[in-house]
Amino acid sequence: MTRLVIIDYGMGNIRSVYQALRHAAPEADVRVISDAAEVKQADRVVLPGQGAMPDCMQFLRDSGLMQAVLDAAASKPLLGVCVGEQMLCDASDESHSARPTPGLGLIPGHCLRFRPEDMRLDDGSRLKIPHMGWNNVAQRLPHALWDKIPDQSMFYFVHSYHVAPRNPAHAVGVSTYGKPGTLPFTCAIARDNIFATQFHPEKSATHGLQLYRNFVNWQP
């Protein structure tokens, strides 16, 4: 039986992620853990995140789980969700100081805030930041976690920052938010045994459950 752990470091939509994974993969042993030893025993790891990235990184450090996550990322399938995706990158402009917040450095890239000037529409109205609600996701590159999910499927977002990966080959999913002509933003990244999404699979109905199911069955 596959043992899958959800990292509980005090910041994340843990209960919803747990329930969605249990529903998507009832044959898996899904656990919420806060002990580094249990991460070592796991076959697969989910890193959720919710709120501000500086706080998430601080809580992860304080929990004593940061090294366990880095060790797991070296060899085990790892899924980052929402701020959990942002934490995988080098740094984020979201910060409590004038300096960017360092991330885990697992996928080269930087987290950027949506630009207010891109939110003004032709009729003078403005889209709100954070980007909140359902939006389509274009599968920019093929990946096992897109299996049985149609291209341009809708997923649920709640965020003000987005990942800009340094290597375009790591951007496997994109979406758009802003005035017509605004460049797409990356909403799913992948490298080797790591996959991460800005959107919330646990809030994304059938397609979100399928993505979780694909993660449980993924053999990178």
What residues fall within each predicted segment?
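Extreme N-terminal starter segment of soluble prokaryotic enzymes
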Residues: 1-5
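Short helix-loop-beta junction
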Residues: 15, 20-28
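A short, well-structured beta->alpha microelement
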Residues: 27-38
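Structural alpha-helical scaffold elements that stabilize or flank donor/cofactor-binding regions
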Residues: 38-39, 72, 188
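An anion/phosphate-binding loop that grips the pyrophosphate of nucleotide cofactors and donors
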Residues: 42
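Structural motif
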Residues: 46-48
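Cysteine-nucleophile active-site neighborhood
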Residues: 51-131
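Amide-donor transfer/coupling interface in amidating biosynthetic enzymes
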Residues: 109-220
